[in-house]
Amino acid sequence: MELAKSFDPKEIETRWYSTWETAGYFSPTDHKGADPYCIMLPPPNVTGTLHMGHAFQHTLMDALIRYHRMLGDNTLWQPGTDHAGIATQIVVERQLDQEGKDRRQMGREAFLERVWQWKEESGSTITRQMRRMGASCDWSRERFTMDETLSRAVTEVFVRLYREGLIYRGKRLVNWDPVLQTAVSDLEVVSVEEQGSLWHILYPFEQLEGGSEHQGLVVATTRPETMLGDMAVAVHPEDERYRHLIGRHLRLPLSERTIPIIADSYVDPAFGTGCVKITPAHDFNDYQVGLRHKLIPLNVFTLDGKINDNAPAEFQGLDRFDARKKVIADLQAQGLLVETRPHKLMVPRGDRTNTVIEPMLTDQWYLAMEGLAKQGLAVVASGKVRFVPENWTHVYNQWLENIQDWCISRQLWWGHRIPAWYDEDGNVTVAHDLEEARKLSGKEILRQDDDVLDTWFSSALWPFSTLGWPEQTPELKTFLPGSVLVTGFDIIFFWVARMVMMSLHFTGEVPFREVYITGLIRDAEGQKMSKSKGNVLDPLDLIDGVSLTELIRKRTTGLMNPKQAESIEKTTRKQFPQGIPAFGTDALRFTFASLASHGRDIKFDLQRCEGYRNFCNKLWNATRFVLMNCEGKDTGLDETLPLNFSQADKWIVGRLQQAEQGVVQAFDEYRFDLAAREMYEFVWDEYCDWYVELAKVQLSSADEAHQRATRRTLVRVLEAALRLAHPIIPFITEELWQAVAPLAGKTGTSIMHQPYPQADPARMDEHAAANVQLLKEIVNACRTLRGEMKLSPAERVPLLIEGDPSRLADFSPYLLALAKLSEVTILPDRLPDTDAPVAITGEFRLMLKIEVDVAAERERLNKEMQRLTLEIGKARTKLDNPDFLQRAPEKVVLQEKERLATFSATLEKLDQQLHKLG
């Protein structure tokens, strides 16, 4: 097979992905006795597009799946998408808004038809992009959270939980988005630091003392409009300033009500005046205070953020922020506004609408969590579920130990409608469908609850609903528990913990045995990637390349604040003056893997992409060299013919075993960064830079058995290296493997189903490794001497070596080629006493036979002696440190002592050379 002269990623990627998917290579193998290995894809939003976080995590999941597939496991990577209630409804509502339509005018049924239409039109975008990333999911099993089977599972879970007494309806405070007019989860609320004000307001006593008209308590607040719903003023029970006032009453300014002064340890005496207004209906902390003191909450907001009829008439109907202005003005007019101070505060805003989120007292459906949480904590404590890195266990435990009941209802139309029906008297019946509800209630006329379930509710069932639950399917039996969940730390509570609890409750099994928590992809400066910052990168732009014009257009379109466009364009022009070149999928995947350490934040650096694209080119060119020198020739397939393996052959085979050992260990420990580094160093530094060059010398040998062994080693080590790297760079390895495999005696239709390389320690030859290491050091020393003497690459010069001839006997042909020498002379005695520079490598002294610039040589020796003096100082510092001597392994201490001895001996020899120069 003839390879193209240069690597063209796009052509190869398109061809091979189509081949794999058509052939059904992504499906479970179901081989008898194969261990199941299952990863559930965290379902992305159905109408979303692939972002860097997706691409990063999908690369890691795919690497694991491909690795375990090659280990012979029965692998399933279960794909699917999430209906993403709020996100999808907003997109469609914006489309309608542009058409001058309103969903409420359309009606629920017509609106949902429109959403389904949008889902069909754009729902395949993200899965198409996943394919471009090389994701080897079993697409034949793709699921959607609102599929008929998954919806049936959602209904079954709701009904069972309700009948078990765990789901109930109650009036509580929730995060309320007045624009969307729905409850939202904490994850959909973004706290933003903003400049506001702290208003000090006088609350007069109900009964005045001492004739002072405004005698009372001064209360500090950042939200004066909510005072219309105040039910008390709280002070700290130990605050000497106010202890004598506890139990008295105050007149609520601007209202005809009186409210009590209460004592509660929630109050911070040092904040503001030490007096806090308590508004149970509009603040989460105040709500808890209200429960402790039996205060009745008074809601003064409508669902769209206006003042309702519970407030004084002059405020009714005003928008909440207009009401704030009027409250301030009226307080000022009445002389009750004592002071206004600038104050920075954290403002909760909706991540979709950017509106200020209101704590709102509403009727919602809740799931009681205490009992479920105990189960969730127990399986992590027992090790049935393990977090990697382990420190995330603490975060998981902390959330579950402080869990609140879960508000599972949302005031949306798109989603799983709550299976609850009401009769004309408001009595509720929970059932699987209307027919069952009629039977249970004995009523014919029933109205279904308008609310839908929180998107996270159906997501919590994902590990078992996608496998066919509540039916007891073979897939459920085989692939639950799953092997590992790969996800981000931001949804440990919202998704990970809930999957654990739901899976345990309904199947008795944990959903997965391990949870690998990835870091967050940030830009090169460590900033979070966001549209508003203008630092977002599209993974497909890195794969295919993008012009500067198109990149600017993408970054400046659809900004919440259009004024940012100018600065974003300026930054983009500075960062990417030529746009972004095409790196190809493999280079991007290699970059992601190399960044996947166990840290919390990951800085994405475009230069790494360039480096790994160069790696792909290097691998391609090395394979072309191997094919040109091995195709049509004897590569040692006939085991009866003699093979004469060199020290170099044995060394590279041994080094391959070490690489295989390192990569397998790295995969098993989720250290993708170490796996990537091991692959890179072996292929680039050892195989391409050294072994291929040594093999060129061997291929010119007159010994046929030597040539045969060289070709055999070239193709077999390369073939194994391609299998080793396949999980991370699947496309290029498949293309190259197809060409190399026959020469290595391998058969099969795809590298995907080849066995993953396993190290054989018996093939590690320490003697060969030591010899090649010495050869490399001598070659490098010669190259250094050539550089310092400013010899042109074409100029061949003689080399004199002082040392044991028996150790250097086989080196001459390699040295002549790799160090560009005209001849090599090995002297058992001392080198000639000349001014020529001498390099020292272990027990050997090297000299290029050439006239010397004495001044330059003196400078070189001084520099090298300075370096050695520095290294000696570092080694001595370590060895003088009692902690190092006590804690470091004995082998490490011994290595450090050997380093010190070697450096000291070399320094002494260089000093002698320096004196010889005069």
From Swiss-Prot:
**The keyword Transport is assigned to this record:** no
Cite the EC number. Answer: 6.1.1.9
Q: Which residues cross the membrane?
A: none
List the molecular function annotations (GO) for this entry. Answer: aminoacyl-tRNA deacylase activity; ATP binding; valine-tRNA ligase activity
Keywords carried by this UniProt record: Aminoacyl-tRNA synthetase, ATP-binding, Coiled coil, Cytoplasm, Ligase, Nucleotide-binding, Protein biosynthesis
Superkingdom: Bacteria
Q: Which GO annotations describe the biological process of this protein? A: valyl-tRNA aminoacylation
Q: Tell me the residue numbers annotated for binding ATP.
A: 531
Query: Where found in the cell?
Result: Cytoplasm
Query: May I have one GO cellular component term?
Result: cytosol
Its UniProt entry gives the catalysed reaction(s) as: tRNA(Val) + L-valine + ATP = L-valyl-tRNA(Val) + AMP + diphosphate
Q: What is this protein called?
A: Valine--tRNA ligase
| Gene it is expressed from | valS
